[in-house]
Regions:
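Short conserved segments within the C-terminal catalytic ATPase subdomain
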Residues: 73-88
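A conserved beta-strand-to-alpha-helix junction within the catalytic ATP-binding
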Residues: 53-71, 87
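Short helix-loop "hinge" at the ATP-lid/N-box region of the Bergerat-fold HATPase_c
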Residues: 115-116
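Short conserved segment of the HATPase_c
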Residues: 147-159
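Short alpha-helical segment of the dimerization/phosphotransfer core of two-component systems
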Residues: 27-32
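Conserved glycine-rich
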Residues: 187-188
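Conserved micro-motifs of the catalytic ATP-binding
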Residues: 13, 47-52, 92-99
Length: 211
């Protein structure tokens, strides 16, 4: 079918129009493929977590591992973004949560990937870990444009995307997948913009502590 369509385009349109139309079609195909991939991953995550046995996970170890990987990759990029970890309020305390380690890594990786994609060059992303009552609190702040205040309550909706074209294509499933995984861990996630003179997005994740 694809060959027939391409042959039709080649025989009915002039060269310039044909190139533009093929580019549009290719772009749409890539978007649909990305959507299918993300949706399939979401279903896989839900199925995996429904079967998985949760155990005690050292959240600080997860954070250190994921951030180290990201900083290593960012060294080879041209954006010059640095991810900093702050857990000074813990005074050396361990932060253990109930969870599936690979999925906790996925949560942080997805959130950092989102933060990096919106961050300008020569900026910093902060990852903070604290204990808030009976939960582990994970906060990620970037120095990007932040969320659109009018639609901030929709950012975790399935297929919702308000990403400007300059920040690249997006399926609208990334944050929804993260939210699903967090809720399957018994946690919650909140999106907001930083307050005061600070500019950028703020994500707060709460996960039940292991007792």
């Amino acid at each position: 079918m694809g060959h027939i369509r391409q042959s039709y385009l080649e025989n009915t349109l002039d060269n310039e129009k044909r190139k533009k139309l093929i580019k549009v079609i290719s772009h749409d195909v890539e978007r649909i493929e990305r959507l299918i991939t993300d949706y399939s991953q979401m279903l896989k995550d839900e199925a995996t977590l429904s079967r998985a046995k949760m155990k005690k996970i050292d959240l600080l170890n997860v954070i250190n591992t994921v951030v180290e990987d990201f900083n290593s990759d960012l060294l080879n990029s041209n954006k010059n973004i640095k991810i900093n970890i702050s857990n000074s309020n813990l005074n050396g305390s361990k932060v253990n949560v109930w969870g599936v380690e690979s999925k906790l890594e996925q949560i942080l990786a997805n959130l950092l990937d989102n933060a990096v994609s919106f961050s300008p060059s020569d900026s910093k992303i902060s990852v903070m870990c604290n204990i808030k009552k009976k939960d582990a609190q994970l906060i990620i702040e970037d120095q990007g444009p932040g969320f659109n205040e009018k639609n901030i309550d929709k950012v975790f909706n399935r297929f919702y995307s308000n990403r400007p074209e300059k920040f690249g294509e997006h399926s609208g499933l990334g944050l929804n997948i993260v939210k699903n995984i967090i809720e399957l861990h018994g946690g919650s996630i909140i999106a907001s913009n930083q307050s005061g003179n600070k500019k950028g997005a703020r994500i707060e994740v709460l996960l039940p502590l292991y007792n």
